[in-house]
Amino acid sequence: MIKVAEWGTGMMGQGLLGYILDRPKDIELVGVIVTNPAKEGKTVGELLGRACDVKMTTDFAAVLAKKPDVVCINTQSNLHEITDQVVPAIEAGCNVICIAEKLSYPWASDAAWADRIDGLARQHGVSVLGTGINPGFMLDALIAMWSSICLRVDKIVATRVNDLSPFGPTVMIGQGVGTTVEQFEKGVADGSIVGHIGFPESIHLIAKALGWTIDRIEETREPIVTKVERSTQHVHVAPGDVAGCRHIGRGYVGDELKIELIHPQQIHPEMEGVETGDYIEIHGDPNVNMANKPEIPGGKGTYASTGNYIPFMKDAPAGMLTVVDMPLPRFWTPTA
């Protein structure tokens, strides 16, 4: 039985809680930490609508004092937003799995932070792992696995075509959905429209797996302008305005383009005949062409990935780890 605590109960956190409750003979849920005081004292059962009397609390020290084997953090995207969660968990002697995109390869955005966490984890004999579907699998770990059947790899081109319709207002703002083209371009320039978070991380994960050294990363963000009216629960887009963002990340070895990751995301792509999907091309010997349609749902893929790594953490080496350091990921069948 693995003792697990969860930190964060948003959409991803709730999905992971469901995964945990589906494994009552494998996982003991020892505590759930929330950041919203309104959830204090309520049970997981009340949150999910299923049987579970574990109470949620803002008192993270009390939960960490129960010595969970693994703490699963599902809160923010950026390193400095999760520091006050990752550090206490490490210092309590807990392994950490976290869905923050920047944690999938933290050296890409803050090498000093990554080295600090690596040293702290080694000092306490625990492992820290960043997971998710993207970054964490579809545009990096899966590519690395496909490369294992190649004699030579010259270049990688991968595309993930997404439907943003299920997501909330924070995602819409970050992708520029509902803006005019002029507002979109201004948002890209001032950093308020970011598109996808994780291209540098995915590029470095692929490079690490293949033994390449990336010398330069370039990113471009272009508006996806709709010809038809589109709307979701959170946003309305008129014809001529922006329905999404076409974000591309390119990684160079010297002056040679070695990795190109393409990620067009928009609301209701089907309204203009666009099919969602995941595509991987490896140019080499032999060539690899993988296509999966429709897309793997980002939410389910993220919390499933997190849960399926839980049993690997006990025997993982201490330190700051990445998915390409870990054993081949797989589905964790619940004990009957």
Protein language model annotation of sequence segments:
Residues E101-V126:
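Rossmann-fold NAD(P)-binding glycine/threonine-rich loop
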